[in-house]
Amino acid sequence: MGRIVLDTNCLIQSISPRSPYRRIWDSFFDGTNLLCVTTSILNEYEEILNLLTNEETAKYIIDAIVSNPYTIFITVYFDFNLIQKDPDDNKFVDCAITAGARYIVTEDHHYDVIKWKEFPGLDVVGLDEFLKHLLKISL
């Protein structure tokens, strides 16, 4: 089991049963991976889900995350402020570092700064790369 932080856009892309990335969402419910979240991340998930779907669907998805035994709730005590171009993205980085996460899954290039820093064991990957990793470990 790996600890993973999933940015909001990647969460949205992985939820639909018709999504090519659905295996990522499923991996948080079958115990393949642990989804690491903070209250701030959950609030952003809910805000965006409310915009893209409706209140009932957003609540259902958030409740599924919160009640999932493979979700780890992280309390961040230090703000690393590594992303200057979009400071709101720092909540995902801070969560990943605090949680000792293996991956941040994102399509956002603001996170490239993490690739330039030497964080042992933390990789920033896109959906396609993470899906390939999942398919490899499920063989």
Task: Identify the function of each model-found stretch.
Residues 10-11, 41, 110-111:
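Alpha-helix capping/helix-boundary segments
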Residues 34, 70-72, 123:
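Conserved beta-strand segments of alpha/beta enzyme cores
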Residues 6, 22-50:
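PIN/NYN-family metal-dependent endoribonuclease catalytic core
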Residues 1-18:
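Metal-dependent nucleic-acid phosphoesterase active-site entry motif
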Residues 90, 109-139:
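Acidic, PIN/NYN-like endoribonuclease modules and their adjacent C-terminal/linker elements
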Residues 7-8, 37-38, 107, 126-127:
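A secondary-structure boundary/capping signal
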Residues 39-66, 126, 133-139:
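Extended, non-globular alpha-helical segments
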Residues 70-104, 109, 113:
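Active-site neighborhoods of divalent-metal-dependent phosphate/nucleic-acid chemistry enzymes
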